[in-house]
């Protein structure tokens, strides 16, 4: 057997450890009077790569559904939205790609406030968690 194929001959080369750049998924949840909020953070090295905010309606009115519809109609690079079900049991999801900084939520801010959703450009997970407040349970 050829030993030179199995063993690296250059013994003077410094050892470089492999850095673990695994993605970690963090979830933060909160119950509100109107429904449930879930923030799902995709994090690598404490930097958020993607955030998905989901509001699941429980006790809502037509105005809340209109807010969800307005959020769903947001067109912005780096933001994907999804609205499911009817006006009484809707689920609205907003996914933000943190590699893109051009998104703007000012046109839907009152709708976000109505559903108690917070969409921030904070890309550090620990700061994003602090920004949510103590009423959220994060795992």
Annotate each language-model stretch with its function:
Residues 6, 12-139:
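Subset-of-secretome marker
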């Amino acid at each position: 057997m050829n030993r030179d194929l199995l063993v690296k001959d250059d013994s003077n080369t410094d050892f470089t450890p492999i850095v673990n750049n695994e993605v970690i998924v963090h979830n933060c949840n909160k119950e509100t009077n109107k429904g449930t909020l879930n923030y799902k953070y995709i994090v690598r090295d404490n930097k958020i790569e993607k955030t998905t905010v989901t509001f699941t309606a429980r006790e809502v009115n037509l105005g809340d559904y209109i807010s969800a519809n307005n959020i769903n109609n947001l067109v912005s690079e780096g933001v994907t939205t999804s609205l499911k079900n009817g006006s009484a049991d809707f689920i609205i999801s907003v996914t933000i790609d943190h590699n893109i900084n051009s998104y703007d939520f000012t046109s839907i801010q009152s709708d976000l406030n109505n559903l108690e959703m917070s969409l921030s450009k904070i890309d550090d997970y620990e700061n994003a968690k602090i920004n949510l407040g103590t009423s959220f349970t994060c795992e």
